[in-house]
């Protein structure tokens, strides 16, 4: 992203991803919920169960990447395709956490909800900075301008 002059997009991806990792660690320490008693013997875990880090990080990373990719597409079908692909990956990761028995369903649901909330906050912050920022570089803003019709809903 930096090499293609999408500086703000690169910053958004970094802040949302690493901020999400920190947020997940703080929440795991705060709740310290034990994992389910029954899970596959070859699965080794070292952290607490709530919230699911995999689900949370999947929602953050794939949600943010889908948002950034959809901003660049002009056609509605392309935006829908990007969002659908991200949703499928997130759901598959969530199902894998339940299949392996390393999380309760509430851990996974909370992980996705918190991840989407954090990613949404980061995306809204990017939009506000680009719209109202005092130090705006016109060249960068033009390159990162959303496709006509605004960001996907």
Predicted regions and their residues:
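Hydrophobic alpha-helical bundle signature of multipass membrane enzymes
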Residues: 1-48, 64-71, 82-84
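Membrane-embedded catalytic cores of phosphoryl/pyrophosphoryl-handling enzymes
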Residues: 37-153
């Amino acid at each position: 992203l930096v090499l293609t002059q999408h500086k703000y997009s690169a910053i958004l991806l970094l802040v949302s991803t690493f901020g999400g990792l920190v947020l997940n660690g703080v929440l795991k320490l705060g709740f310290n919920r034990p994992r389910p008693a029954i899970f596959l013997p070859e699965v080794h875990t070292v952290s607490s169960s709530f919230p699911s880090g995999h689900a949370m990080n999947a929602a953050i990373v794939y949600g943010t990447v889908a948002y950034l990719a959809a901003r660049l597409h002009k056609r509605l079908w392309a935006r829908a395709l990007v969002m659908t692909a991200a949703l499928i990956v997130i759901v598959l990761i969530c199902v894998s956490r339940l299949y392996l028995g390393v999380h309760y369903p509430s851990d996974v649901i909370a992980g996705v909800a918190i991840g989407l909330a954090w990613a949404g906050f980061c995306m809204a912050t990017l939009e506000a900075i680009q719209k109202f920022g005092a130090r705006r570089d016109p060249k960068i803003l033009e390159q990162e301008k959303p496709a006509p019709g605004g960001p996907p809903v």
